[in-house]
Amino acid sequence: GKGGALAQCGGNALVQGEADGSSFPSGGLRSTFEARGYTAWDVTSPAYLMESPAGMVLCIPTVFLSWTGIALDKKTPILRSNQALNQQAARVLRLFGVEPRMPISSNGGLEQEYFLIDSNFVSARPDLLIAGRALFGANPPKGQEFDDQYYGVIPSRVLGFMADVQRQLYRLGVPVKTRHNEVAPSQYEIAPTYESGNLACDHNQLIMTVLRKTARRHGMSCLLHEKPFDCINGSGKHLNYSIGSPEVGNLFAPGDNPHENAQFLVFLCSVIRALHCHAGFLRASVSSASNDRRLGGHEAPPAIMSLFLGDQLTD
């Protein structure tokens, strides 16, 4: 108003923003001039500061919607599914005389596997540079018989990389817990502490970002492709999943007498029923060219949706 420069950014400017959404699938329900999309701060996931050579950047977890409310991102469906989960889980708990006062949500522990390859070797392979996986090459001398890597000592160069990654993730608020060798040669794993599903997904994205950036600084390339090499194990993203809250605990916990724990059996049967009725949707949610190449070959999970309850519950 007085011709001066704006030198501040208020909180209201961060809570909601407007971005172009014309290139995102909005269901064809907009007029040609309605190209806008909206971002909104997801306050359930903490903001963080990401350091880069250009300076410090404030990163705010957000949802991205079309002007009609259609989700244009992958965070909104998670938040909406948690809402639906809370409503239905609370409804079932009331049948057992439990009135939950705290929201019930999904919880997850995402274990991230990856390959570390020296950058000099990767630079000599255009397929690794472009596709992130080997398109040709000789078979390894062993397949599933490899055990010297998994039960061996972590190489000092890799251990230095892991320690660097862990320090950076702690600064970003990611509670990483374990780091170890994996089965295939040059394959490793990092896993965070179990946490709420929405936060676990955000932290997994941060873990993958930090792994790639840090590997370059250590003269290595981090391959996150699910199946970068044939005839040896690929890299999975094992998800330890449950539902519950601090108030009601883990609703998948069987207790001392699972056969007599009616509440546990009801929630267990709901998962079995959901898998039976919606196997196609669940399979599609993890379907991609890279993951479909991994499933069913030198791996534990098959290419179909399956469920194993263990001998005790099956009997």
Regions found by a protein language model. Give the residues of each.
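Glycine-rich, acidic/polar active-site loops that bind/position phosphate-bearing ligands
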Residues: 1-225, 229-315
